């Protein structure tokens, strides 16, 4: 009975050093889990961007009405380039994020800025491609543009799939932007609140 009590007492009375080591171990496990999650989140857009890029590169059709290719339209060429850039960046940033090195403020700022820039690049690519695809599907009576997808249905189907995958990649980049924003701004302390008693109000003569 005495021995059991001493064991319980030893377990309860942990030294400050032991408690500090336990806190550091818990923090290390949390950091490792977050690093793994961020790495996978950065790797996921690689497959999406490559899929959208390949689909767009294969978007061409030739029939009795003529021929059409993705390279005929600047919006689709931009989508290909944007997806290629984003795929390369996602792979590179995933490798950097997977490295077990301390996250410094310059590194956090770099990820934050690049994530923001790449998000807007691929969002713009999806937006302009959607507009062109809408015109190809429906035409424009005001400018006497007829619908092209009635004659080139296979081309439009591939382009639609490529644009849809691009918007899934946009969603992933929005999440990455939120993650990098959180990691950056948590490195700064919140502004200290000034007590109302310390605020001096200037007295003006009546």
From Swiss-Prot:
<feature type="topological domain" description="Cytoplasmic">
    <location>
        <begin position="180"/>
        <end position="206"/>
    </location>
</feature>
<dbReference type="GO" id="GO:0005886">
    <property type="term" value="C:plasma membrane"/>
</dbReference>
<dbReference type="InterPro" id="IPR006702">
    <property type="entry name" value="CASP_dom"/>
</dbReference>
<feature type="topological domain" description="Extracellular">
    <location>
        <begin position="129"/>
        <end position="158"/>
    </location>
</feature>
<dbReference type="InterPro" id="IPR006459">
    <property type="entry name" value="CASP/CASPL"/>
</dbReference>
<keyword id="KW-0812">Transmembrane</keyword>
<feature type="transmembrane region" description="Helical">
    <location>
        <begin position="159"/>
        <end position="179"/>
    </location>
</feature>
<feature type="transmembrane region" description="Helical">
    <location>
        <begin position="79"/>
        <end position="99"/>
    </location>
</feature>
<comment type="subunit">
    <text>Homodimer and heterodimers.</text>
</comment>
<feature type="topological domain" description="Cytoplasmic">
    <location>
        <begin position="100"/>
        <end position="107"/>
    </location>
</feature>
<feature type="transmembrane region" description="Helical">
    <location>
        <begin position="37"/>
        <end position="57"/>
    </location>
</feature>
<comment type="similarity">
    <text>Belongs to the Casparian strip membrane proteins (CASP) family.</text>
</comment>
<feature type="transmembrane region" description="Helical">
    <location>
        <begin position="108"/>
        <end position="128"/>
    </location>
</feature>
<protein>
    <recommendedName>
        <fullName>CASP-like protein 2A2</fullName>
    </recommendedName>
</protein>
<feature type="topological domain" description="Cytoplasmic">
    <location>
        <begin position="1"/>
        <end position="36"/>
    </location>
</feature>
<keyword id="KW-0472">Membrane</keyword>
<dbReference type="Pfam" id="PF04535">
    <property type="entry name" value="CASP_dom"/>
</dbReference>
<feature type="topological domain" description="Extracellular">
    <location>
        <begin position="58"/>
        <end position="78"/>
    </location>
</feature>
<keyword id="KW-1133">Transmembrane helix</keyword>
<keyword id="KW-1003">Cell membrane</keyword>
């Amino acid at each position: 009975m005495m021995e059991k009590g001493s064991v319980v007492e030893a377990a309860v009375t942990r030294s400050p050093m032991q408690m500090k080591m336990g806190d550091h171990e818990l923090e290390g496990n949390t950091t490792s889990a977050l690093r793994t999650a961020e790495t996978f989140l950065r790797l996921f857009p690689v497959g999406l961007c490559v899929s959208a890029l390949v689909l767009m590169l294969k978007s061409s059709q030739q029939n009795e009405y003529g021929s059409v290719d993705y390279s005929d339209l600047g919006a689709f060429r931009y989508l290909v380039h944007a997806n290629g850039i984003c795929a390369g960046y996602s792979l590179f940033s995933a490798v950097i994020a997977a490295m077990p090195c301390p996250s410094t403020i310059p590194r956090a700022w770099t990820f934050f800025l690049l994530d923001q820039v790449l998000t807007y690049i691929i969002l713009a690519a999806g937006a302009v491609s959607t507009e062109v695809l809408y015109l190809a599907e429906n035409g424009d009576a005001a400018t006497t543009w007829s619908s092209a997808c009635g004659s080139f249905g296979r081309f439009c189907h591939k382009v639609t799939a490529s644009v849809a995958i691009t918007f899934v990649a946009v969603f992933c980049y929005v999440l990455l932007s939120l993650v990098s924003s959180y990691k950056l701004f948590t490195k700064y302390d919140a502004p200290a609140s000034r007590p109302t008693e310390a605020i001096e109000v200037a007295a003006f003569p009546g």
